[in-house]
Amino acid sequence: MYGGDFDGNAAFAGGGFMPSQATTQAHESSSSLKNRDVRTLLPLTLKQLSSASTTGESNFSIDGVDIKTVVIVGRISRMENRITQVDFVVDDGTGWVDCVRWCHARQETEEMEAVKLGMYVRLHGHLKIFQGKRSVNVFSVRPVTDFNEIVHHFTECMYVHMYNTKLRGGSITQDTATPRPQMPYSTMPTPAKPYQTGPSNQFPNQFNDSMHGVKQTVLNYLNQPMHIVSEAGVHCDIIARELRIPLLQVKEALEQLSNDGCIYSTLDETCFKSTANA
């Protein structure tokens, strides 16, 4: 996939994950839908990005949701290194967009050194428009190492679009909305809150009736910030020792969490990392 054009059929041939169906309790009226905080983080295809409506140089909206920060997955088709910035073009098969990554700090420079022409990347950035031309001011970018992530991104884009368009056309209000239990780490929409990504990617069965005891304890442990940022993950022996849970139970919990799409193995089948922010 690195050497040629984006192949949509090939990308969707793999397996992906849908966001969790968990929702949180409604506290707002649906009339506030169009007044979302501009910091809302939305996964978008470049076709969606190009069709987003705008009322100025920094006010964008799509499906009735205000946006400024976007998540994009695509292939770098052009790249130019400058003294204090890197200009590049990302193509995801639905369109392309100019991107710029400013490199003032060492960490920013090292981040861009890991990105090469032809690579598929996942980036976060602010959507801008200047003289009628849209671009993304990137503040985070990394190579895609698991191509299931491409499938997941497109699936999430479709899910978010369908949810927000159905919500916008519905007539659910605060009086008619049915309260639902709050779930840890949930980023799913309420009847008055559009879908937006949060600190983790949520997948099916992550929080259901069977997610109790050891599984939840292990997941919470792997979702700690110190483990989220670790590329190597955590060894099952360390998890068992830290949590004081029998190793056999920890291994069973890890296997179930892996099947649920909540975690994945890293160095080998004994080290695991949460899919949060993967």
Curated annotation (Swiss-Prot):
InterPro entries: NA-bd_OB-fold, NA-bd_OB_tRNA, RFA2-like, Rfa2/RPA32, RPA_C, WH-like_DNA-bd_sf, WH_DNA-bd_sf. Residues 70-143 bind DNA. CDD domains: RPA2_DBD_D (cd04478). Its main location: nucleus. The keyword ATP-binding does not apply. Phosphorylated in a cell-cycle-dependent manner (from the S phase until mitosis). In response to DNA damage, recruited to DNA-repair nuclear foci, as a hypophosphorylated form. GO terms for biological process: DNA recombination; DNA repair; DNA replication. The keyword Nucleus applies. GO terms for molecular function: DNA binding. It is found in: Nucleus. GO terms for cellular component: nucleus. Keywords: DNA damage, DNA recombination, DNA repair, DNA replication, DNA-binding, Nucleus, Phosphoprotein. Belongs to the replication factor A protein 2 family. Heterotrimer of RPA1, RPA2 and RPA3 (canonical replication protein A complex). PANTHER family: REPLICATION PROTEIN A-RELATED, REPLICATION PROTEIN A2. Component of the replication protein A complex (RPA) required for DNA recombination, repair and replication. The activity of RPA is mediated by single-stranded DNA binding and protein interactions. Required fo cell division in meristems. Involved in the maintenance of transcriptional epigenetic gene silencing (TGS) at specific loci (including some transposons) by regulating histone H3 acetylation, 'Lys-4' and 'Lys-9' methylation. This is Replication protein A 32 kDa subunit B. The gene is RPA2B.
